[in-house]
Amino acid sequence: MSPKVQALIFIVGLITLLAAHAQEELSDNTESERGCSGAYKRCSSSQRCCEGRPCVCSAINSNCKCRKTYTELFKEYFEK
């Protein structure tokens, strides 16, 4: 394979990687603009959790936080 083709493949791969990373950051910003809380952030009846995560509260309802779903935890465990 010629060096020009290798350079082109490298550049296309780098652009793809950067675009995927930018898309992740954009989706995080969109969720915060919608007014939802991410994983392990505070939540309430007026501030819901993003991505359908459950809002888990202490026994006296004073410390509510969004928890990751079992699917997310399972996925993270096997991605390591």
UniProtKB/Swiss-Prot annotation:
Disulphide connectivity of cysteines: C36-C50, C43-C55, C49-C66, C57-C64
GO cellular component terms, A-Z: extracellular region
Gene3D superfamilies assigned: 4.10.40.10
Localization, UniProt: Secreted
A GO term for molecular function: toxin activity
Recorded superkingdom: Eukaryota
SUPFAM superfamilies: omega toxin-like
Expression across tissues: Expressed by the venom gland.
Family: Belongs to the neurotoxin 02 (plectoxin) family. 05 (U19-lycotoxin) subfamily.
Domain notes per entry: The presence of a 'disulfide through disulfide knot' structurally defines this protein as a knottin.
Listed name of the protein: U19-lycotoxin-Ls1a
Species for this entry: Lycosa singoriensis (Wolf spider)
